[in-house]
């Protein structure tokens, strides 16, 4: 759910494997990332922000929303993906009221390809650092 609307997220092979590993470790609860205080509530933005700070990222370096901004910028700049596909992946609502009323496309096939290529690129970046 995002903004009280269902949001389907295509997963890369890498993310599916990580989620399976998390499932194996953390049990079989309803939430993948539960709050440390309650198994019925998801982890909060503050919890994610605290994790970034523990990794020594300063306020001016990274925030939780920064991951979405970084993905949007890089995916748009590379020129391989249509703007509508990127916006759908980020669950951004169309600002044009008429288009928003009529276009309910989810672009799932294109988003699946985009997310797999994004994950592959991240793997390449990590490998090049080593």
Language-model features: where?
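Catalytic-site neighborhood detector that most strongly recognizes the C-terminal catalytic loop/helix
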Residues: 1-4, 16, 80, 90-125
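Extended, non-catalytic subsegments within catalytic or DNA/protein-binding/adaptor domains
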Residues: 23-29, 49, 110-113, 122, ...
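Residue-level detector of conserved, well-ordered beta-strand and adjacent loop positions
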Residues: 12, 34, 103
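Short, basic (Lys/Arg/His-rich) helix/loop patches that form interaction surfaces
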Residues: 9, 17-40, 46-88, 92
